[in-house]
Amino acid sequence: MTPIAERPTDVASRTVPGHWEGDLIKGARNRSAVGTLVERTTRLVILARMEGTDAVSAREGFTRTLRHVPAALRKTLTYDRGKEMAKHERLAQRLANQVFFADPHSPWQRGTNENTNGLLRQYLPKGTDLSGYTQRELNAIAYQLNTRPRKCLNFATPLEVFTQLCHHSPVALGT
């Protein structure tokens, strides 16, 4: 388990894209979950349907979802120390990225993700059975958040900024 203190310094500055924060939001009686991923530079949100709340479900859900992101834009993932990330080594191996863990009881170290989880509760209220949501429905929710202008992005949307990086920035993509 690699602590956040060993994370590259460019992650904190948000100047280099490809660094993600991840978490699970849990549903009714902690029996269902949705994986949340937020890219730190662009604030792009990706939601992953989970089959359960265990480590295998988290690994499979995050792997399935992050495989659609260009390799150059999935460098690191910062997570809390929840038991659902017990299989993080296999996730890192499958995606060829590094996984870092925030210090215990330090949600501010993943503030972008915590803020996003709060925004998601507008669409996925606490106490909801999240297992009933399809990946298509989760993608529609993520689209709503990704097309919302953000002050921190000079009122561009996360989707606009991320798309621009994917299509127009050879430096950001390492090509």
What are these regions (language model features)?
Residues 126-175:
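C-terminal domain-tail junction helix/linker
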Residues 79-92, 101-124, 131-143:
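RNase H-like two-metal-ion nuclease catalytic core shared by retroviral integrases
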Residues 47, 75-78:
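Short catalytic-loop micro-motif centered on adjacent basic/acidic residues
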Residues 30-32, 40-45:
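Coil-to-beta-strand transition motifs
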Residues 1-34:
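Mobile-element integrase/transposase regions
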Residues 43-48, 101, 126:
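Short small-residue beta-strand/loop micro-motif enriched in glycine and branched aliphatics
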